[in-house]
Each structure stands twice: as structure tokens, then as C-alpha cells.
């Protein structure tokens, strides 16, 4: 895979420019997925992209997948370090479809719920809905996003080598490392994403650019 050195800001500008290009058959809203393990810092690129879009006069709404965790009773049903549950049961994908994607489908309302569950209090956040106007861009970021057939108009996977992932993951979360290895094998985010970013050193990312499909 050929990679080009680039800054996060320049990457965001390139992504924003791609989203500005006219496309056939698109709805009133565009959906972007920025996928990567927690150690990959997907929120950094999400914020940079939102800023780049706003500078172009576009509305942008950033949603973190971490705001859609399942209640603790479901996440820890089979123990606090169950890899299978982490892969398939930690994130409330049904709520993401219902509260994030359905409102931004053609004919949707644009009323997006920015988060649903607070894992610290283990209670609903009760956040108000955010209104994303037509022409706006929804940016969803977080781990394990590319294995659910989410309808992204543009997807980015931030990849870390196994060594970098282990170094940058808190030791208390090292039990999740096999989950990300399985995700890489089974869902193939490095090949399915529209753009692949290598960020072993977050100060010096490199990427493929936006790949033609």
C-alpha cells in the first residue's frame, strides 16, 4: 500500500474537498465514518474535518460512537473482559441506525441524537436532538464501525500496527487487543475504507488518499 505523508489538517481539507464534489443519487445529508481503535484518536480527525467543512460554509455534526454504548448489564453480561461481547455487543448499533442514520436518510428529518448513554453514570444522557440542516455532514467516529454496513458516503480507517496499538492502549484495556486483531481479519477495514491512514506516530500520519471505487 502506497502511503503519502500528510498533516491531520491537510487531510481534513482533502476530505472536505471530496465531500464538496457533486455526486449522483445522494440525499440531503452526507455521512462520514472515521473508524479506529480508541488509541487511534479518531476524534482528532473528526474535529479537524468538521472545522474544514464549516470553513467551506457547510454544517457539520460530530457524533462519537462512545456515546452509544450499551448499558453495563449488557456489556458485562459475560464478564468485563469478554472479547466476543466487545466486538458485537458493546455498542448499540440499533440505536445508531435509529437515531443517527435514519434521520439523515433521504426523506429524513435531520434530527440526530448526539449521544444516548453515559457509561460513567450508566444512565441515559437525555441530550437534546441536534438539527442538521440539508447539505450538512454527519461525522461518526469510533471503533469497529466498518463491520455493520453503515451507509457512509465516505469512510476513513485509522490504522495502528499491533505494536503501536499495544503501546498506546491503556494496560487496563489490553484485553481488547485480540478484538481489534479479529476485526482487522474479519471486517478488513484497511481495504474496505475509502481512505486508509497509518498513524503509529500520531505526529506524522500518512495515508493512501481517497481511493477510487
Predicted region positions:
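Conserved nucleotide-sensing/catalytic segment adjacent to the nucleotide-binding pocket
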Residues: 61-64, 70-122
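ATP-dependent NMP and nucleoside kinases share a basic, alpha-helical "lid"
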Residues: 123-169
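Glycine-rich phosphate-binding P-loop
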Residues: 33-51
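Pre-Walker A (Motif I) flank of P-loop NTPase domains
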Residues: 27-32, 135
Amino acid at each position: 500500500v502506497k502511503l503519502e505523508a500528510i498533516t491531520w489538517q491537510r487531510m481534513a481539507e482533502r476530505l472536505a474537498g471530496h465531500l464538496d464534489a457533486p455526486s449522483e443519487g445522494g440525499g440531503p445529508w452526507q455521512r462520514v465514518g472515521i473508524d479506529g481503535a480508541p488509541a487511534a484518536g479518531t476524534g482528532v480527525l473528526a474535529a479537524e474535518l468538521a472545522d474544514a467543512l464549516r470553513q467551506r460554509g457547510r454544517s457539520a455534526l460530530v457524533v462519537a460512537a462512545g456515546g452509544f454504548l450499551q448499558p453495563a448489564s449488557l456489556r458485562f453480561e459475560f464478564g468485563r473482559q469478554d472479547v466476543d461481547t466487545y466486538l458485537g455487543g458493546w455498542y448499540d448499533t440499533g440505536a445508531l441506525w435509529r437515531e443517527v442514520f435514519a434521520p439523515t436518510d433521504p426523506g429524513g428529518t435531520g434530527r440526530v441524537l448526539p449521544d444516548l448513554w453515559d457509561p460513567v453514570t450508566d444512565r441515559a444522557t437525555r441530550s437534546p436532538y441536534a438539527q442538521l440542516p440539508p447539505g450538512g455532514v454527519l461525522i461518526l467516529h469510533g471503533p469497529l464501525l466498518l463491520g455493520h454496513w453503515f451507509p457512509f458516503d465516505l469512510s476513513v480507517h485509522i490504522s495502528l500496527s499491533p505494536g503501536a496499538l499495544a503501546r498506546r492502549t491503556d494496560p487496563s484495556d489490553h484485553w481488547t487487543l485480540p478484538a481489534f486483531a479479529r476485526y482487522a481479519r474479519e471486517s478488513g477495514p484497511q481495504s474496505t475504507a475509502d481512505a486508509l491512514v497509518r498513524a503509529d506516530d500520531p505526529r506524522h500520519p500518512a495515508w493512501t488518499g481517497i481511493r477510487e471505487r
